[in-house]
Amino acid sequence: MKLKVGVIGCGGIATGRHIPAYINNPNTDLVAVYDSSVEKGEKIEEEYGVKAYKNLSEMLMHPGLEAVSVCTPEMTHRDIVIEALKSGKHVLCEKPMALDSKQAEEMLKVAKKTKRILMISYNQRIYEPHWKAKELLKQDIIGKPIAFRSFLSHGGPEIPYMERTGRSDFLTKTEGTVAFFYR
């Protein structure tokens, strides 16, 4: 039996990661998408034959829908995650989880109350350069660090949607990998 999933937000992380992962996973069935941009949702509907909704609440009532990925800008995460949890869905939310610890705690309380799973997509925990760093540490090649910092970056121009969505300039500079070890 396949897990019936939906994707909320049809931007780059959804179209580049979540949607292809669900489409190609034999254990999942992507059944619904929602984006505040109707055109983005319709494009996914045309490309994959998945029902695109114009209203989030309606999408969350899709028959058989069990779990959703939240792939929207972080300032929307709390409200969307809470609505999805209250509708009985398990949630995989993109990072960062929330704007502050108060919002994160609210989300966790609702997950606990509804007995739904809330998982945050901190995918860098399994990122190959981080595993290599762990290997080097185990072999005592680089010594004992007192702090570790990793940045993800791209080599292209600034991302035009950042200003429009309110995402900080910091995020535009932290995509790609550079690791720093401090002793």
Residue ranges and their predicted role:
Residues 50-110:
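Beta-loop-alpha module in the N-terminal Rossmann-like domain of NAD(P)-dependent dehydrogenases
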Residues 106-123, 143-148:
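Rossmann-fold dehydrogenase core element
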Residues 124-183:
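Predominantly a Rossmann-like dinucleotide-binding segment in NAD(P)-dependent oxidoreductases
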Residues 25, 62-63, 127:
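Acidic-histidine catalytic/liganding microenvironments
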Residues 1-48:
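N-terminal Rossmann-like dinucleotide-binding module
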Residues 27, 64, 141-144:
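Glycine-centered tight turns that cap/initiate beta-strands
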Residues 32, 66-67, 147:
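Short, Asp-centered acidic motifs that coordinate Mg2+ and/or phosphate
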